[in-house]
From Swiss-Prot:
Pfam families in alphabetical order: Ribosomal_L16 (PF00252)
Family matches, as InterPro entries: Ribosomal_uL16 (IPR047873), Ribosomal_uL16_bact-type (IPR000114), Ribosomal_uL16_CS (IPR020798), Ribosomal_uL16_dom (IPR016180), Ribosomal_uL16_sf (IPR036920)
The entry's keywords: Ribonucleoprotein, Ribosomal protein, RNA-binding, rRNA-binding, tRNA-binding
Species assigned in the record: Thermotoga neapolitana (strain ATCC 49049 / DSM 4359 / NBRC 107923 / NS-E)
GO cellular component: cytosolic large ribosomal subunit
A Gene Ontology biological process term: translation
Function recorded in the entry: Binds 23S rRNA and is also seen to make contacts with the A and possibly P site tRNAs.
Name of the protein in question: Large ribosomal subunit protein uL16
Family: Belongs to the universal ribosomal protein uL16 family.
Length: 142
């Protein structure tokens, strides 16, 4: 599972997901990308499930880039515990995703396989996404 090696503070506040993604909105490494259309927290388990799903469709050919990283801890209090008594323990790690962010990129496979792999990965996520190509300007990839 993806998670930071060490963090300065063990627990974080929830924060809010206003607006669109500032960076990471273009396909920069692969030929096809999966773009988020809604804001959400994507867990480390969901990222791993997507990676395995894409590998299965691609039959280990090509290359996958994971453009998000779960660097935010989320906490949860035990079941049936009373309110108060401090913040709960860290339950897992999430990546904060805003609309427009590229989540995964794929290269080295044909268009049909890339679309199928990214669609399969999208089914593992709790948000709406779309498959986008790498932009080419004047014959050169951007």
């Amino acid at each position: 599972m993806l998670m930071p090696r060490r963090v300065k503070y063990r627990k974080q506040q929830r924060g809010r997901m206003k607006g669109k993604a500032k960076g990471g909105t273009l396909v920069q490494f692969g030929e096809w990308g999966l773009k988020a259309l809604e804001p959400a927290w994507i867990t480390a388990q969901q990222i791993e499930a997507c990676r395995i799903a894409m590998m299965r469709v691609m039959k280990r050919a090509g290359k996958i880039w994971i453009r998000i990283f779960p660097d935010k801890p989320y906490t949860k209090k035990p079941a049936e515990s009373r309110m108060g008594k401090g913040k709960g323990n860290v339950e897992g790690w999430v990546a904060v995703v805003k609309p427009g962010k590229i989540l995964f990129e794929i290269a080295g496979v044909d268009e049909e396989t890339a679309h199928e792999a990214l669609r399969y990965a999208a089914s593992k996520l709790p948000i709406a996404t779309k498959v986008v190509p790498r932009h080419h300007i004047g014959g050169e990839a951007v």
